[in-house]
From Swiss-Prot:
Protein name: Small ribosomal subunit protein bS21
Swiss-Prot/TrEMBL keywords: Ribonucleoprotein, Ribosomal protein
Cystine crosslinks: none
UniProt similarity note: Belongs to the bacterial ribosomal protein bS21 family.
Gene Ontology biological-process annotations: translation
Chain segments carrying region Disordered: 35-58
One Gene Ontology cellular component: ribosome
InterPro entries, A to Z: Ribosomal_bS21, Ribosomal_bS21_CS, Ribosomal_bS21_sf
Gene Ontology MF, one: structural constituent of ribosome
């Protein structure tokens, strides 16, 4: 979980900017999008193999 403490004499905008940067770096939004809908294990395996095939032939 990303956590940002607002420093003395720091504007809320800059603290929010730091928080957003930390979330992006941690991959929070990507994880949320990935888990938005349930994927069965067979679908996950299929996507993983297709991605590997794409990387190999690119």
């Amino acid at each position: 979980m990303s956590e940002v403490r607002v420093k003395e004499n720091e504007s809320l905008d800059s603290a929010l900017k730091r928080f957003k940067r930390q979330c992006a770096k941690a991959g929070v939004l990507a994880e949320v999008r990935k888990r938005e809908h349930y994927e069965s294990p067979s679908v996950r395996r299929k996507k993983k193999s297709e991605a590997a095939r794409k990387r190999r032939y690119k």
